[in-house]
Amino acid sequence: MGSVIQLKNKVNNAYLDLKNSVDDKIILVEEKIRNKLISDVSLVEKMTSYNLETGGKKLRAMLTLSSSKLCGYLKGGRDINLAACVELIHAATLMHDDVLDNGEIRRGKKTINSIWGNHASILVGDYLLSRCFEMMVEDGNLEVLRLLSATSAKIAQGEVLQLQHKSEIDTVEEIYLKIITSKTAALFSAACKVGAILGNKDEKLKEALSSYGKNLGVTFQIADDTLDYNSDLKKFGKTIGKDFYEGKITLPIIILNQQCKSGERDMLKEFFSKRERTENDLKYTLDIIKKYDIIKQCYKKADHFISLASSSLNIFESSEQKNILKNLTSFSIERSF
């Protein structure tokens, strides 16, 4: 038992090490976002203030700051400005995501759409994106503008691809990976690559950080999707079975559908063909997930992407920042919050 606690402490320390290494700048990122979102429309003010108060770990912004530091960008405020851009893209996509999913809880708090409705959530999400693009233009770097605008388009396409395959029980792993690479990993990748651009690094180093971010993002999404069948609301701010009730076909269901017996497969097909799934449907699914040890298999798949993320950093010289980013790969899959 002691060794498990030590592992969890070590994993969570990887996140804290990252946070501590950029803590002074994260405060400035939050201030930048707050100032940029000021509006004379009272509802916009209320909704953006609530979004800031209930914000998450700011991990993507931290990755931009950390990657910039790794690549020698130490003076000037461009890293702060672009980390804020990355965070705004993320916040906007979450607002839109919650509308699509009819989400009511995120990070243990009520979602914006559950308080103010879908119409206002979509419009304020658009407002966040428009402010983000203003900041990108202010930065003035065409490469950054191309990268982040292309990333925004990729995220949207990933969401549409997921909608296209919603409730399709025979979705293959290749399609699943394409979805999460677009809707999640693309922003992780861009957040890291921005740091290499700011540091004026060559294409090899830019692509190395891009690859690191992409594989880290894939790992994070696999972890999130797996937690949906093995989660704790107090720790993770999400209720178990959310994806199941929404009819999303994620890695645990894909692997389960491949390995379970024909009768069980027929039951899964029936569940996902219905407009709504019940608590008993979820209980049956959780039982056979446990029966075939699906959670362990999902984490094993994620290990492959952890390895790819870590090895992407080998091209960089030894440094404290490199170690912090390498250690973060374990946090992505084994985190306890």
Q: What are these model-predicted stretches?
A:
Residues M1-F337:
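All-alpha prenyltransferase/terpene-synthase fold signal
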